């Protein structure tokens, strides 16, 4: 289901970065787009979001999440919980196949259609087909270098694209906070 992308988020030193590759894969055999942007700034530029999964489903979830952010006046956790409640109980939305990584200056959250809203202990999170590779790389970089959040996201995505056939080297990164 989640083949075709890697999204990684890192929080470090007052900076939060989310990045993703640009590959869109049709089925398991055909790359149909190389330069997709799967990362967005939401809520007046104060929230970052990235998706893995079906593109149309993710756009539906982005729109719904943005509405929940407005309703909660930018409270990331409340908006995420409200999104999951709606996602799980609505007959149409329940069928959507995507995951979101969202972040503000304070936290990074994973939001899934199975009801999870998870905040990592270490300020590092990744999803998608190359997510495990990017997560391992980001954790190593955060523990053994002085790189910024943006640089860690970039480097971990580069490592993931060298390993995962569903991840490419067209990388988009957005940040909030920092210098």
From Swiss-Prot:
It comes from the Bacteria. It is found in: Cytoplasm. It holds the Pfam family Proteasome. Transmembrane segments: none annotated. Its EC number is 3.4.25.2. Allosterically activated by HslU binding. Na(+) binds at residues 164, 167. Its main location: cytoplasm. InterPro entries: ATP-dep_Prtase_HsIV_su, Ntn_hydrolases_N, Proteasome_sua/b, Proteasome_suB-type. GO terms for cellular component: HslUV protease complex; proteasome core complex. The keyword Cytoplasm applies. Keywords: Allosteric enzyme, Cytoplasm, Hydrolase, Metal-binding, Protease, Sodium, Threonine protease. Coiled coil: none annotated. One of its GO terms (molecular function) is metal ion binding. The keyword Metal-binding applies. CDD domains: protease_HslV. GO terms for biological process: proteolysis involved in protein catabolic process. It catalyses: ATP-dependent cleavage of peptide bonds with broad specificity. The active site is at 5. A double ring-shaped homohexamer of HslV is capped on each side by a ring-shaped HslU homohexamer. The assembly of the HslU/HslV complex is dependent on binding of ATP. Belongs to the peptidase T1B family. HslV subfamily. Protease subunit of a proteasome-like degradation complex believed to be a general protein degrading machinery. This is ATP-dependent protease subunit HslV. The gene is hslV.
């Amino acid at each position: 289901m989640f083949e075709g992308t890697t999204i990684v988020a890192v929080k470090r030193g007052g900076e939060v970065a989310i990045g993703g590759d640009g590959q869109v894969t049709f089925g398991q055999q055909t790359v149909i787009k190389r330069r997709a942007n799967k990362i967005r700034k939401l809520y007046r530029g104060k929230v970052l979001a990235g998706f893995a999964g079906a593109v149309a489903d993710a756009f539906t979830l982005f729109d719904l999440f943005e509405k929940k952010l407005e309703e909660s006046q930018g409270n990331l956790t409340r908006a995420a919980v409200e999104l999951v409640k709606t996602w799980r109980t609505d007959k149409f939305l329940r069928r959507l196949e995507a995951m979101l990584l969202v972040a503000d200056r304070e936290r990074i959250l994973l939001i899934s259609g199975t009801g999870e809203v998870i905040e990592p202990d270490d300020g590092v999170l990744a999803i998608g087909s190359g997510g495990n590779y990017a997560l391992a790389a980001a954790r190593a970089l955060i523990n053994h270098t002085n790189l910024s959040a943006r640089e860690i996201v970039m480097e971990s995505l580069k490592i993931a694209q060298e390993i995962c056939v569903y991840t490419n080297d067209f990388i988009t990164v957005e940040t909030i906070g920092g210098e």
